[in-house]
Amino acid sequence: MSIPQGLQERAAELRQLLNRAAHAYYVLDAPDLEDSVYDRLYRELLDLEAAHPELVEADSPTQRVGGSPAEGFRSVTHRIPLFSLDNAFSAEELRGWYTRLLKVLDREPPSGSPLPALAMVGELKIDGNALALSYDNGVLVRAATRGDGDQGEDITANVRTIASIPLRLHLDPPPAWVEVRGEALIPDNTFAAINSERAARDEPLFANPRNACAGTLRQLDPKVVAARRLDFFAYTLHLPEDWSGERPTSQWESLRWLEDAGFRVNPNAALLPDVDSVEQFFGDWDSRRHDLNYATDGVVVKLNDLRLQDAAGFTQKAPRWAIALKYPAEEAPSRLLKLTCQVGRTGVVTPVAEFEPVSLAGTSVSRATLHNADRLQELDLHSGDTIIVRKAGEIIPEVLRVLPELRPEGALPLELPQQCPSCGSDLVRESGEAATRCVNSSCPAILSGALRHWVSKGALDVDGLGSKLIEQLVERGLVRSIADLYRLDTALLTSLERMGEKSAGNLVAALAQSRTQPWSRQLYGLGIHHVGEVNAKALASAFADAHSLADAAVQRPEAITDLHGIGPEIAQSLQQWFNTSANQDLLQQLRAVGLTLAASDQERQALADRNNGKGHLNGQTFVLTGTLPSLSRSQAQALIEGAGGKVSGSVSKKTSFVVAGDEAGSKLDKANTLGVSVLDEAALMLLIQNSADTIHLL
């Protein structure tokens, strides 16, 4: 059954918005939304992908925990990964989680019987910044940001300035090592004092305590951190398996252990006997949260018994034994100022409402997406309308409703323009589609989007070519197609704003290097409608070059729909794309500047081996952990898969090898426990080269 085009476009939009938000939060250190916005948007994408698994793309934020560490601090690998939490937004979702937990624990009651009671701990979900603290022999040796869950940034010098974090544990004797997780924050009264001091110095004010805390933790000068008086609440404890001291057997005992060790634990945590008590605890704090001296955005619920936690285990992203129950999102009234439009890579025109700034959960909001013409018509927006804005379910907040009783006399209805705001071409809306599009292939906005997609991480992965530089290149007419990127030289680039000779040289080199990217990445980079990273890999595995793919798309579409996971909509999209003369010209231009648009000999051989089960690593499963000396994880994975192997995210008895680098985490410990062979990078390379008799096992 084909997926409605509107759902596919919505999923693509959600992926783009969520990934952009994650990049702003984790890499740029410039958060642009509150958690409730991200949570609801993430849930919408999760529901879409659950209903239509074909929508899952490799770049979907649901496939990962999170984002990459920013530059400027040393990257470190966490001894024990930091997982995300699944979210619930209602009592029904809370009970759904609890029912699933009972099923996993084989405690599901007979049909019609009441749910058995399991003790849980309710903790306030502090709206701060997660930290991972490492103690060796009782001494704080490292503090790191959460990062992507596996790797974070070493900010030990800054964290040492937080008075509520002990530099030495209050234990005698201490365990050989202790891992503590908790939340750094700036209390509201401290935040008010900081902003008052900044105002007196005529400095920009911080938007909210969370942003101020995040920026403070990444200050290069620890004296600045000390002056801002951060606080910390501990909530998770990890101890060595072989420690002979008194070991907590429950989450409640873990919190008491942390208190005894010298940590500040949030005093509002509660031991709750059943799920009804959890609902009462949540409702109580939902009404009382504004009385606290710090922000909270929900309640974290954890199964109390640690043995049951171990039995419940983890999904790929989150523990099954815990959930975050989130407070409802906020709403606020504002006055509509004007309607603007954005043009995306595929030509879709999205209306955006601009209104008087309002504060929602500590952030200033002045724009909200209206999605499409149907939503615009449904809201019946007029100039000057009073609107209700909500930060929920959207990265760019949404207009929830209009208050027509407050509409100014003579206000005119707002409609989508008939012409593209970027190029002036007539806009088109196909029958049955919600989207309105610009179909001018020379539209600057479409070209800019196509260029951003081509150089993105999942495609050609060109470092140093950001959105602002792309806009300059397009505005000056220096780049009129993707192929023109490969005609840029250092002299031309240095004529642009903020582009020095070194940066220009690096960009030219990065573009040259991108010519060697695999055929699947080149195919994905073309931006063909419906062809995401996963589909591009499937197509590239079946068709070794653009010529054979184009021939199949135009002459033999059944050869495409016969592929697993490739439906008629993708086949039709490919047929339309390859039949378009402008795209045929683009392929010729790309070949003229050195792009092969084909699999290399090595790729073809590896593909043939995999398809025939002849790869010498066929049937072998690998797990990667730690930082390898010269290979990134993606490079190591590509090499393993190229030789027929499979890469997994978790260690089990079925794992063939664990490849361990520096600061390998719990996966290495589990490999040793299970007796799984462990390789270093050199051994991996020898194994890939089919010299298994000489490999070095760690």
UniProtKB/Swiss-Prot annotation:
Cellular component, GO annotation: cytosol
Active-site residues, Swiss-Prot/TrEMBL: 125
Domain of life: Bacteria
Keywords: DNA damage, DNA repair, DNA replication, Ligase, Magnesium, Manganese, Metal-binding, NAD, Zinc
One Gene Ontology biological process: DNA replication
E.C. numbers: 6.5.1.2
Location of the BRCT domain: 612-698
Cofactor(s) annotated in UniProt: Mg(2+); Mn(2+)
Binding site for Zn(2+): 420, 423, 438, 443
Residues annotated for NAD(+) binding in this entry: 35-39, 84-85, 123, 146, 183, 302, 326
GO function terms (MF aspect): DNA binding; DNA ligase (NAD+) activity; metal ion binding
Catalysed reactions listed for this entry: NAD(+) + (deoxyribonucleotide)n-3'-hydroxyl + 5'-phospho-(deoxyribonucleotide)m = (deoxyribonucleotide)n+m + AMP + beta-nicotinamide D-nucleotide
A family per Pfam: DNA_ligase_OB
UniProt record similarity statement: Belongs to the NAD-dependent DNA ligase family. LigA subfamily.
Role: DNA ligase that catalyzes the formation of phosphodiester linkages between 5'-phosphoryl and 3'-hydroxyl groups in double-stranded DNA using NAD as a coenzyme and as the energy source for the reaction. It is essential for DNA replication and repair of damaged DNA.
Stated name of the protein: DNA ligase
Annotated organism of origin: Synechococcus sp. (strain WH7803)
The encoding gene: ligA
